[in-house]
Amino acid sequence: MLNIGDSVQIPGCSTKKRLLETTSGCDSFDTLLGGALVNSSIVLIDEYRSRCYGSYLVRSFLAEGLHYGHRCFVADPSEDVSETILKVIPTRKAAEDDQKKEIPSSPGQADNDMKIAWRYGNVKQVTSEIGPSGNQYDFSKHLENSNVDVYNEEIPSFSGLYKILCEVVQKEEAHTKSTGRGGPKKNLLRVVLKNIHLNIWEDYESLGRFLCCLRSLARSSYAVIYIVANSHRMPNDTWRQLESAADTHIQLMPFNEQEKKMFRHLGTAHGYFHLKSLPRLMSAGTHTPPILDLIFEASSKKGFQIRVMHLPPAFDEPAPGQQKATACQNIDF
């Protein structure tokens, strides 16, 4: 939260209720959060039974930061991120591409569209979309040179990672919070920590201490942190530590084979989007989405989209207030 008298202007950020906010790169995700990501917050992404869908949110997060000139930092001890995720960061769509979608292909197309009766004109239409339709990034085209800092150590350790993060935050005081006006120019730091739940860290038993220090570091800096993990492969007590450290907690649970057959009407949806918790950095009350029955779709064509889950009507069941007549009602005495 900004102190009284503070004046910070960072590209890609806005101030709301004395809180600095930034976009995640996914419009539907921002809408669920109340408009944007809150500065100094930690977002926990639980890839339950999967390791492929959370990368869409991470790539949008990094692409948005690179677009506005934010500093980005990625740490993943299990793989070389320079050869994986950094090679598939999407490019931002041009404004001309969105305008082409709105222009009809033929002059008479707009007149030939179907129209509903006038008495239904003011009836609210049911839609599954959350927030603005479409996506700002093209996942089929990738950035050639992504300026992202990478955590690279032969023996990964939480103590070494925290030391590097402190050096990044304090370098030239670009990401440290300061009171009053003046001082060095500030910038936002976007951090992505992947697979910190794996038992390949040298000081894995110090995960709880690392999370406490990380939370304190985030509160005192202009930074937003993404943590990507898998609760399905973690002990319950270890996962509780991650949940306690996170301000925003979401879970991506893909459909199993039976659910894919059951939910064919959902089209290309890939799984459930569970919203576990929202940030409470300013008050005990927080933004509450109007509905929590959500699904997600992740593809290179549409990117990552969150939709409302609409169940098909049950045609076999009688309508409300109507019941089938029983045989006893036709008996004459």
UniProtKB/Swiss-Prot annotation:
GO biological process, one term: regulation of transcription by RNA polymerase II
Lineage top rank: taxon: Eukaryota
Cellular compartments per GO CC: cytoplasm; elongator holoenzyme complex; transcription elongation factor complex
One term of GO molecular function: phosphorylase kinase regulator activity
UniProt-annotated location(s): Cytoplasm; Nucleus
Subunit structure: Component of the elongator complex.
Any one Pfam family match given in the protein's UniProt record, by short name: PAXNEB
InterPro entries, A to Z: Elongator_complex_protein_4, P-loop_NTPase
Entry function: Component of the elongator complex which is required for multiple tRNA modifications, including mcm5U (5-methoxycarbonylmethyl uridine), mcm5s2U (5-methoxycarbonylmethyl-2-thiouridine), and ncm5U (5-carbamoylmethyl uridine). The elongator complex catalyzes the formation of carboxymethyluridine in the wobble base at position 34 in tRNAs.
Organism ancestry: Eukaryota, Metazoa, Ecdysozoa, Nematoda, Chromadorea
Protein name: Elongator complex protein 4
UniProt key word Cytoplasm: yes
Family according to the record: Belongs to the ELP4 family.
Pathway given in the UniProt record: tRNA modification; 5-methoxycarbonylmethyl-2-thiouridine-tRNA biosynthesis
Keywords, in A-Z order: Cytoplasm, Nucleus, tRNA processing
